[in-house]
Design a protein with these regions (language model features):
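A structural "domain/chain start" motif
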Residues: 24-94, 210-222
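Surface-exposed short loop/turn segments
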Residues: 108-166, 180
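Bacterial N-terminal signal peptides
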Residues: 12-22
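Short secondary-structure boundary motifs at beta->alpha junctions and helix caps
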Residues: 157-218
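Stable alpha-helical elements in mature extracytoplasmic
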Residues: 76, 80, 84, 110-114, ...
């Protein structure tokens, strides 16, 4: 018992020393001890005063990519929607399975409004990702990877009475990964890097809707 207490004390002292040496304030240290690391409120929650984590809320995610993007990345619209859906689900947001949405889209090629999807699946919100650009290569290079994309992420809230929807949230999203230097194709396969970037991009989009920790922000520079 005494040995265990001593180990705990030593670990606490080491953590405290690291914080002091790295410039942490005593207030921050105390906050960590009491409630854990500080979290960031989702931008969607701040702007709309609503939350996708509320009880009985269900969300559909759909992505649109123009022909010029799908020429190089054939299924990027479905892939990104799938990754974002999984991120939301992992953060306790109820979602429509992405394969069901893909099936509906395949059967309704002429759809043009997010509310059509919302009405069919009887959800409260539709997250609509309008992908304007997407690449996995460093500019001017064919053997260096760097994911880049530009998109508009909007949320459509379904009317409780009829099938209409209102756009209640919209944000431009510009993404780049890694931030500091590209990755050589000799170090990672194309498939591996693509998965890494889609994971990163989907988390950047997901953080608009779920809480995350400031420590995650610091450690995600790439």
């Amino acid at each position: 018992m005494l040995a265990t207490s001593k180990r705990v004390s030593m670990l606490f002292a080491a953590s405290l020393l690291c914080c002091v040496l790295s410039g942490c304030s005593y207030v921050m240290i105390f906050g960590y001890l009491i409630g854990g690391p500080p979290s960031v409120e989702p931008q969607f929650d701040k702007e709309t005063k609503e939350s996708m984590t509320d009880k009985d809320v269900r969300v559909a995610v759909v992505c649109f990519a123009p022909t010029e993007i799908r020429y190089s990345f054939e299924s990027i619209d479905h892939e990104l929607a799938q990754y974002v859906t999984h991120q939301l689900h992992a953060h306790k947001i109820k979602v429509v399975p992405p394969d069901l949405i893909k099936g509906w889209l395949d059967e309704h090629k002429d759809w043009d409004k997010p509310e059509e999807i919302g009405a069919y699946f009887k959800v409260k919100y539709v997250v609509y990702i309008d992908l304007n650009s997407f690449t996995l290569y460093e500019e001017g290079s064919s053997n260096l990877y760097r994911g880049r994309s530009e998109s508009i992420v909007s949320v459509w809230k379904m009317d409780e009475v009829d099938t209409h929807a209102e756009k209640i949230f919209s944000v431009d999203k510009t993404s780049k990964y890694p931030l500091f230097q590209p990755v050589s194709s000799g170090d990672k396969t194309y498939t591996t890097f693509k998965g890494e970037y889609l994971t990163r991009l989907s988390d950047e989009i997901g953080r608009l809707f779920y809480e995350y920790y400031t420590s995650d922000e610091i450690g995600s520079g790439g």
